[in-house]
Amino acid sequence: MKPSLTPLVFAVAGFLAGCSTAQNQPPGPLTLKAAYKNDFLIGVAINQSQFNDQDLRGDPIIKAQFNSTTPENILKWESVHPELGRFDFTEPDRYVEFGEANHMFIIGHTLVWHNQTPRWVFEDADGQPVTREVLLQRMREHILTVVGRYQGRIKGWDVVNEALNEDGTMRKTPWQRIIGDDYIEKAFQYAHEADPQAELHYNDYSLENAPKRNGAIALIKKLKAEGIPITAIGLQGHVKMDWPSPEQEDATIAAFAALGVRVMLTELDVDIVPATQHNRTADIALNAQAASGANAYANGLPDDQQQALAKRYAELFRVYHKHRADIERVTFWGVTDGDSWLNGRDRINYPLLFDRNGQPKPAFDAVINAVQEK
């Protein structure tokens, strides 16, 4: 008896119908990392609850939208090396495991900074400043231990953070006072010794202002002339609604790219709340003073301001996309508005692409659309 073809026909028809249905389904919403996949990495700074998968609102956004990650605090000296002779890698290990599990380009932040560094680093047992030799030894031990632990896993390090004054001169930090200006060279040398393949960055804010930018340019030229392995400049990107202008941002990126280093936007957010004082910096101390006032949008961000924020992000990303050959990464400093450091005791801010409920804002669409403009 001839076998019936009916079941086979229905099976094939069902398969083809399924294929047709799948092909006809509209694509899902475009993500940030997909929109810029041919241009640069899209990163985000995350906190402990997020890399421990405890933030039910933020974690899905991180995994869907971003392909690079930076830790907010857990790799700063006071957290990872709180006492002489004692390191604590509990949280950094989890951070790196989170990044690897989600196939992210992992950044280490930060090795040498004057803030969030314990006093013992700079003092002897009597509370007096240590010698240059002792501080260099402590710096080297710290960098070799931390960077060496994650060799080949953390791909890029913010080696030195915020070493310049607003006029471009060297900031008089304990590092500079005890070691001298060459503490920066030493830090980069030690980081390269610990992981010769890692990208090494100098990171700072307000580099769009010409005096400070010129100081950073001189610093990078000096490092490169001495054969110091600096890979990239990190423009923090803590911007205002009216500063820097697109022209300033364009000129700044071009100036650093001309030096032969990669450019990173490392801590991007847009402060939309009017400040109580004229402050164009990301200095923690100054912003702590300003944070107690200027609560202009305590009941939510009005629609006109949402649209203004979207326009601001769009003009920034047009500049970034223009320089996509020189920019390696754009990292947002926080996931949702509620995560932002720009919120204060009496100051509610809205500087990011996702609101406090984890919903995309008009600014999100503006960033996506900026890359699609012809």
Each predicted region: which residue ranges?
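C-terminal motif of bacterial Sec signal peptides marking the signal peptidase cleavage site
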Residues: 17-18
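Boundary/entry segment of secreted carbohydrate-active catalytic domains
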Residues: 24-68, 72
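Aromatic-rich peripheral "rim/lid" segments of glycoside hydrolase catalytic domains that contact
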Residues: 27-32, 119, 145, 149, ...
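Acidic (Asp/Glu)-rich catalytic clusters
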Residues: 33-37, 56-67, 93-105, 147-151, ...
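Structural preference for beta-strand elements that scaffold enzyme active sites
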Residues: 39-43, 67-70, 105-107, 154-158, ...
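Acidic-and-aromatic substrate-binding clefts and catalytic sites of carbohydrate-active enzymes
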Residues: 45-56, 77-90, 164-169, 206-215, ...
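Short, acidic/polar
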Residues: 49-64, 137-146, 212-223, 313-319
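Substrate-binding cleft and catalytic face of glycoside hydrolase catalytic domains
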Residues: 64, 68-82, 91-207, 274-275
